[in-house]
Design a protein with these regions (language model features):
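A detector of single, family-specific signature residues
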Residues: 1-378
Length: 378
């Protein structure tokens, strides 16, 4: 079937004898149920559909319990130019399915899909908070308050305390400096900090700051609720796997729940750890022609999983007494490798560890030092 982004689903039923049945259905639930009943009437066994944004999800939910479904990457079933239409797309998908030319994408169980919704909502809220903080800092800079030049970041306690006071209507530098941490004052001098807090603040600026601060607080509240819900589900249904994942160096509750949300706990979907690494986009692409390697950049993959595991890799590269730290030192200082490439290599190793932990249901065991000299590829 070919799913469109508007209000139509093009169904093509292809039998082993070559008979073709084509029909167009709407996207409402009752219309999807009519389509399901028609497919049951014709004894359909396998169903293939393109992964079109999020439009495949409602169709999947209606058909999941009745058919063997395959979610197909559109990249693998591209049509020839000049032969492109919704009906022909449906025919082409049916033909590829019958001849077993395509494989289905990984679609986790319903509970893991629910965890994914929380996990990706958290990432969206993180990005939203960063954008709002940047806008808030722009308003502060417009008022010529230069405190951000002297604090570590715009999410620091001192910076937020000063913003809170300004939103309350306090604009005197002598009063605002009381909210700044003593270490910052000692480092840069009290007079310098007071001068950085002296600006031209209007009522409109205070109003906009108050609105932005309220939006940031709301986003942080929603983020905290999502974190609690995700953690509650994992502790209730995947407690053993959650505990085992947290034995990996620097992998704590947030990262462990994100790993479960993205890859699930059943590793039968990934035949080997290399399959999982490839799916996450942590392997070099195969771009070679006439014995010339054109590119070895990592591939596109699950960006949420890759983001989580790379963040963990940065921490693991600094975690003393563990293999990942020794590996990072050996590759960057002894072999003079690029640090970012080493981080990608560490993240791949950590993902392999996660695959083995979930597959064997065991805790993490650190690598031997001898691996450092034998494993030169990273």
């Amino acid at each position: 079937m070919d799913l469109t982004c508007t209000d139509s689903i093009y169904l093509c039923i292809l039998s082993s004898t070559g008979e073709i049945l084509e029909q167009v259905f709407g996207v409402l639930t009752t219309q999807l149920e009519e389509m399901r009943d028609l497919m049951l009437k014709y004894n359909v066994q396998e169903v293939g559909m393109e992964s079109t944004s999020v439009y495949w999800i409602p169709v999947w939910r209606v058909l999941e319990s009745h058919f063997e479904l395959k979610l197909i990457n559109p990249y693998f079933i591209k049509q020839l130019p000049g032969r492109k239409s919704d009906v022909k797309d449906a025919q082409w998908i049916a033909e590829c399915m019958m001849k077993e030319l395509v494989r289905g994408s990984f679609v986790p169980p319903e509970r893991i899909q629910q965890l994914r919704l929380y996990d990706r909502r958290i990432y969206d809220l993180d990005d939203e908070i960063i954008r709002k903080l940047a806008k808030l800092d722009a308003v502060i800079q417009r008022c010529n308050i230069r405190l951000s030049n002297y604090v570590s970041n715009t999410d620091s306690v001192s910076y937020k305390s000063v913003i809170d006071k300004i939103c309350e209507g306090v604009t005197s530098p002598e009063e605002l400096v009381k909210e700044v941490h003593g270490r910052i004052i000692n480092r840069h001098g009290k007079e310098t900090i007071i001068a950085s807090l002296k600006g031209c603040i209007t009522e409109v600026d205070i109003d906009i700051m108050t609105q932005l601060k309220a939006e940031i607080d709301l986003a942080e509240l929603h983020k905290q609720k999502c974190l609690e819900k995700k953690q509650d589900i994992c502790e209730r249904e995947y407690s053993e796997q959650l505990s085992n994942l947290q034995t990996i160096p620097v992998v704590k509750m947030k990262a462990a729940t994100s790993l479960i949300a993205e890859i699930g706990t059943d590793m039968s979907h990934f035949e080997t750890a290399n399959h999982l690494s490839s799916w996450a986009g942590l392997r070099p692409r195969n771009d070679q022609s006439n014995k010339i390697i054109k590119s070895r950049r990592i591939t596109h993959g699950n960006r949420y999983l890759r983001r989580t595991i790379i963040q963990c890799a940065w921490g693991a590269s600094r975690a003393k007494d563990y293999f990942f730290c020794r590996f990072s030192y050996y590759q960057t200082q002894v072999r003079k490798k690029n640090r970012m490439k080493v981080i990608v290599a560490i993240s791949r190793k950590m993902l392999v560890c996660a695959w083995l932990i979930l597959k064997e249901n065991v805790a993490y065991k650190d690598f031997d030092n001898k691996i450092l000299t034998s494993d030169t590829k990273g």
